[in-house]
Every structure is written in C-alpha cells, then in structure tokens.
C-alpha cells in the first residue's frame, strides 16, 4: 500500500515492475498471463496474484498450470536469475559474432543451441524452428560445425522472425493472449512449426 510503480520492463521471460522499495519479478511460466481489469470484477479461478491500482483497476496474474512465479527483489539485492542470461535477441548486443564464438566446440544441435537462454534469451521452440528454416539451416546440424556465414544469416532471421511475431501480437497456439485478452496472429504465418 502506498507504493508507486516507477517502471515496467522485461528481461528474458521475466516481467519487472519497479517500485520505490524494490522490484516485483514475474515469470508467466507455460500458460500464465497478466491482465488489467476493473478492481470490482470478481477474481477468477487460477488468479494467483492481484495488484490493486489507485485508478480502480487491478493487474491480475492468471496461471492455470502453476508453472509461473512471483518474487520480490529489494533494491539492494541481486537476483541470481539474471546472472547467466544471454543477450536479448533484438538488442545490439546480440549479433552473429556472439553466436559464432559461443558455438565453437559445441556438439549439440543448432536448434537446441539457440534455444539455450545462456546463449540468447527469447528464442523458444517456435521461433527457433522458423528462424532456422528461413536461414536454410537444418535444426539437426551441429552448432560447432556451423559456419560464420550461416550464423550471419541465422542472426538476421532470428531478428526478423521475432520482430514479425511482435508486430502480429505473438503466437497463439492454445491459450496465449496479450494483456487485452486478444490472441496473437503470428501462428497464421508460420512456415514450419507444427508441421511434419
């Protein structure tokens, strides 16, 4: 009570809500969602957290599968959650050089490699499949045996695919919805994900 929201941001799959005394750290898990609704609206099943705002609205965390989490970080605390995370894929810190150098000596396949959040965050199964297809790279190819030229193409494709997904409101396959409760439409333009 009496706290002010100073900033809302994101790091990897974490939503960060900065207050005067600390930061609320939310992870949506597999099927969690956040919505902003009138405070008088009744709580629904699987609403596990409510932040009541002073404008008669509430931010609610809905998590039917209970894979999500909510943590509080005091201003003077460092959370280990972010320590080993790779760069954001749409940031200038993410480039083909980082991917190429990180891949040297790795035997795992390239799809698993780019889905590793220690390498780059935010490239999940759908976006890895689509990016590799667009770059013309087999997902089974060994990460350590992939050329720098292929990593240049892959990096560009990751950035394009993720930008397109954001522009289309995300990818709704089962139960994903954005903060307004609307589905994402990127699933309508998927080239390979979910196909045999």
Specify the residue positions occupied by each region the protein language model found:
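Basic, nucleic-acid-binding surfaces and adjacent catalytic neighborhoods in DNA/RNA-processing proteins
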Residues: 9, 102-196
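Phosphate/anion-contacting hairpin/loop surfaces
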Residues: 24-122, 127-134
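Generic beta-strand structural signal
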Residues: 10, 18-19, 53
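A glycine-biased structural micro-motif
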Residues: 1-6
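Short, surface-exposed charged micro-motifs
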Residues: 7, 16, 50
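Short, solvent-exposed polar/charged micro-motifs at secondary-structure junctions
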Residues: 16-18, 71
